[in-house]
Structure formats: C-alpha cells, structure tokens
Amino acid sequence: MPEKYFEEINEETKIIYYYSFSSEVVKFFKKQPEVFIKFKENIKKMVNGDSNIDIKIYQGKIKKQSEIFRKLRTLRMRIGNFRVIFMIKEEYDNLKIYTFIIKADSRRDIYKN
C-alpha cells in the first residue's frame, strides 16, 4: 500500500503512472485497498479511451488548492459506494500520467467539508 507517492509502469504500453496522495487518502486506502486497486484499473482504462467508467467533472470546491493544480480538471470517480476525487495530468509525448488523489471516502461522507 502506498504512503504518499506511488509509481507503476505498464509494461505493455510503457506508460508510467504516478500517484500522489494526501495523508487522509492514504488512511482510507489502507482500510479499503480494493478501492485503490479498482481506481488504478479505471485510470488505465480511461487513458486507453474506455468510456465505460463512472467519471465526471467534480462540481465542488477544493480547499487550499495550489496554483499548479488550478489548471487541472478535478474529477470524481465512482467505485461502488465509494467516491474518489482526483486531478490528472497526461503527458502522452513523455508516456507519463500524473494522478493527484485529493479525497476518497464513502458516498455518504465524501462531500462533507
């Protein structure tokens, strides 16, 4: 299970996936490792053009968002009864995908501030 940062290489496509987490997200994924596994699978599907994933643009506000992140889209992924709010930066020319996971929790608690 990742601490604050995780890196993975897809041997088939040679794309490098970088995942960055808040401390809150690390705790959640330690309790719900299957959600992290499914999240990674869905990110790869999304990058490969699969539209059969429940991902939408996040409509809420993110507190304390740094300048770098303001330029990125904030997305929400549904995984069963859980939601993951994240940002993604795709560098296809360098074969790199950066994923910044902001929050992960149950559907009931994800949107509470």
What are these regions (language model features)?
Residues M1-E8, V26, T74-N113:
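Enriched for short, Lys/Arg-rich terminal
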Residues M1-M46:
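Arg/Lys-rich, positively charged N-terminal/basic patches that mediate binding to nucleic acids
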Residues M1-P2, K38, I57, S66-F69, ...:
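Short amphipathic alpha-helical surface micro-motifs
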Residues M1-Y5, I43, Y58-Q65, K89:
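Intrinsically disordered, low-complexity boundary segments flanking structured domains
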Residues I15, Y19, K61-L72, E90-I97:
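Intrinsically disordered, low-complexity coil segments
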Residues I43-G49, I110-N113:
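Short, surface-exposed, polar/charged, turn-prone segments marking secondary-structure boundaries
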Residues K45-R76:
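A short, surface-exposed loop/turn module that caps and links secondary-structure elements
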